[in-house]
């Protein structure tokens, strides 16, 4: 009986390593050519995925940089625009300062020589008109013209049989264009028939 037990033990011991070898062989057999191809394809897909992920990250970073650059550009142009609007009249005002200087000179002469005051005022008037002309400010012709509500504002009406109705008789306050827009309408007196 002991021999049988020994044989069984030997046989059992011998079977176990064989079983292990069989399992390994089964595992190796499971990975056949088709499975190897699938594994290779999976590796290729993984490589492709990683490449696409890298490209995605690169493009995302590029987008974020461009977005930040554009945001900085927008902020900078807004600041420049605000500064430009804040100081837009500065050059025009610099041109007006000599006009003010001439007025002050003319006023200094008011007690000594009235003719010098008149000459100073005339000079200042010409200088101011020249500056306005340089900035495309032009007078609106009103006297003798047909009344135009876009250019004139009627303050008074006078009955006149010798003129056509709605003719500007008198310009009370001069009107001006700035480029092609009315800066200020002319204040006028208009004719009316009885």
Swiss-Prot record:
Region described as Disordered: spans on this chain: 1-41
Species this protein is from: Carboxydothermus hydrogenoformans (strain ATCC BAA-161 / DSM 6008 / Z-2901)
Gene3D superfamilies found in the cross-reference section: 3.90.20.20, Head domain of nucleotide exchange factor GrpE
Subcellular location(s) per record: Cytoplasm
Keyword Metal-binding attached: no
Gene Ontology biological process: protein folding
InterPro entries according to UniProt: GrpE, GrpE_coiled_coil, GrpE_head
Name by which UniProt lists this protein: Protein GrpE
Biased composition (Basic and acidic residues): 1-24
């Amino acid at each position: 009986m002991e021999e049988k037990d020994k044989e069984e033990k030997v046989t059992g011991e011998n079977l176990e390593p064989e079983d292990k070898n069989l399992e390994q062989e089964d595992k190796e057999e499971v990975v056949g050519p088709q499975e190897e191809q699938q594994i290779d394809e999976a590796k290729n897909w993984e490589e492709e995925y990683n490449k696409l992920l890298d490209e995605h990250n690169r493009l995302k970073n590029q987008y974020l940089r461009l977005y930040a650059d554009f945001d900085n550009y927008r902020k900078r142009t807004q600041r420049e625009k605000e500064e430009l609007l804040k100081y837009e009249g500065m050059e025009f005002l610099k041109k007006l300062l000599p006009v003010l200087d001439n007025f002050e000179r003319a006023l200094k002469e008011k007690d000594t020589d009235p003719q010098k005051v008149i000459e100073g005022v005339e000079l200042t008037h010409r200088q101011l008109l020249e500056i306005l002309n340089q900035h495309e400010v032009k007078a609106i012709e009103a006297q003798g013209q047909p009344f135009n509500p876009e250019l004139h504002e009627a303050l008074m009406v006078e009955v006149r049989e010798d003129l056509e109705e709605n003719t500007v008789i008198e310009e009370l306050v001069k009107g001006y264009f700035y480029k092609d827009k009315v800066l200020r309408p002319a204040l006028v007196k208009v004719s009316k028939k009885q």
